């Protein structure tokens, strides 16, 4: 069925209804918190948000106990991965009283273009792609820009490596060679037959990771293989579009048996870059960094200007044509006000 396109007024009405519902839920939560704080609460302790359910979160204490908690009204928006201070209640429901500083946060624009955190304290972004649906360098580069902008180490992961055959091997190899040449860590695995899964486990050990990538690349299947017994509801590729059906619904943090954590967040079909500037995009292309600021003109657009350091590097072979094309495509997709 074709996607329904809403008018601006319809979108506004939907947002208004959602805001009113959220406000009513917040008032109910505020009353619940007041009732809890009026009773007996335990001492303050630190914990980590391992799941978010709108107006409530699940918090794991230092000893591994998990509790459902209400949120104080004066708290900033919490996301999975946040470290918090909380107090346990006498009926199994606690209260979050403070958010501890974040070491990092992964953000993306919401439907209105406002920046919204989706995970906190992540130190590794695993960018998952697969032979099917067909991988596109432009989408991978968008994720890399987001990772560089957030200061989070990326790991490129080709899943479904068992689907590489004579029909797609040449294109897949060419794509992988681009990122190997740039020095990005890259692993080829198969959640289906277990290929290189131990190598992946070793790369994830000791890190807080989040998997990103378009639907259908097998993120949930990877989670199920890495964490046996954890069901994240795997969806099949759509027979009509060839794209994946979105199945994971709630961001949740899992512990790997050998150490390290995984935040499994809802599938993202295409990661938006509305929150970054032209300078951020340029900085996200790591091979540009030593060249930026060396053009003849300070306002160089790296298009056809004489004395452009990037164009000279492209001519000399220090910048790959695929990467320059991807850079230009990403800039063309951004609002002109961000240039």
From Swiss-Prot:
Native source organism of the sequence: Pseudomonas aeruginosa (strain ATCC 15692 / DSM 22644 / CIP 104116 / JCM 14847 / LMG 12228 / 1C / PRS 101 / PAO1)
InterPro entries hit by this protein: G_CP_dom (IPR030378), NA-bd_OB-fold (IPR012340), P-loop_NTPase (IPR027417), Ribosome_biogen_GTPase_RsgA (IPR004881), RsgA_GTPase_dom (IPR010914)
The name on file for this protein is Small ribosomal subunit biogenesis GTPase RsgA
Q: Which PROSITE patterns match?
A: ENGC_GTPASE, G_CP
Using the chain's own numbering, where are the disulfide bonds? Answer: none
Organism taxonomic ancestry: Bacteria, Pseudomonadati, Pseudomonadota, Gammaproteobacteria, Pseudomonadales
Name of the encoding gene: rsgA
PANTHER family, per the entry: SMALL RIBOSOMAL SUBUNIT BIOGENESIS GTPASE RSGA, SMALL RIBOSOMAL SUBUNIT BIOGENESIS GTPASE RSGA 1, MITOCHONDRIAL-RELATED
Q: Name one GO cellular component term.
A: cytoplasm
Its BP terms in the Gene Ontology are: ribosomal small subunit biogenesis
User: What is written in the cofactor note of this entry?
Assistant: Binds 1 zinc ion per subunit.
User: Which Pfam families is this protein grouped with?
Assistant: RsgA_GTPase (PF03193)
């Amino acid at each position: 069925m074709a996607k329904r396109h809403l008018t601006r007024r319809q979108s506004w009405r939907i947002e208004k209804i959602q805001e009113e519902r959220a406000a009513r839920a917040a008032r109910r939560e505020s009353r619940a918190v007041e009732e809890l704080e009026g009773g007996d609460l335990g001492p303050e302790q630190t914990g980590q948000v391992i799941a978010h359910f709108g107006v409530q979160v699940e918090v794991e204490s230092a000893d591994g106990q998990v509790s459902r908690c209400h949120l104080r009204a004066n708290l900033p928006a919490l996301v999975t991965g946040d470290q918090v201070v909380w107090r346990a209640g006498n009926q199994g429901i606690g209260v979050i009283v403070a958010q501890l500083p974040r070491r990092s946060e992964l953000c993306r624009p919401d439907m209105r273009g406002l920046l919204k955190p989706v995970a906190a304290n992540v130190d590794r972004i695993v960018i998952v792609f697969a032979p099917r649906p067909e991988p596109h360098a432009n989408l991978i580069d968008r994720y890399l820009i987001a990772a560089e902008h957030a200061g989070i180490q990326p790991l490129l992961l080709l899943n479904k490596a068992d689907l590489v055959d004579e029909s797609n091997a040449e294109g897949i190899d060419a794509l992988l060679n681009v990122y190997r040449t740039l020095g990005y860590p890259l692993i080829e695995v198969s959640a289906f037959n277990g290929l290189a899964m131990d190598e992946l486990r070793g790369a994830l050990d000791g890190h807080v990771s989040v998997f990103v990538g378009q639907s259908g690349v097998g993120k949930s299947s990877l989670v199920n293989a890495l964490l046996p017994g954890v069901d994240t509801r795997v969806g099949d590729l759509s027979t009509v579009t060839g794209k994946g059906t979105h199945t994971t619904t709630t961001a949740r943090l899992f512990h790997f048996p050998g150490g390290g954590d995984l935040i499994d967040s809802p599938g993202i079909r295409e990661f938006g870059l509305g929150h970054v500037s032209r300078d951020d995009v340029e900085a996200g292309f790591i091979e540009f960094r030593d060249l930026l600021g060396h053009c003849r003109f300070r306002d160089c657009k790296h298009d056809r200007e004489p004395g452009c350091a990037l164009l000279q590097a492209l001519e000399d072979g220090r910048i790959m044509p695929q990467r320059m094309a991807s850079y230009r495509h990403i800039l063309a997709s951004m609002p002109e006000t961000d240039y």
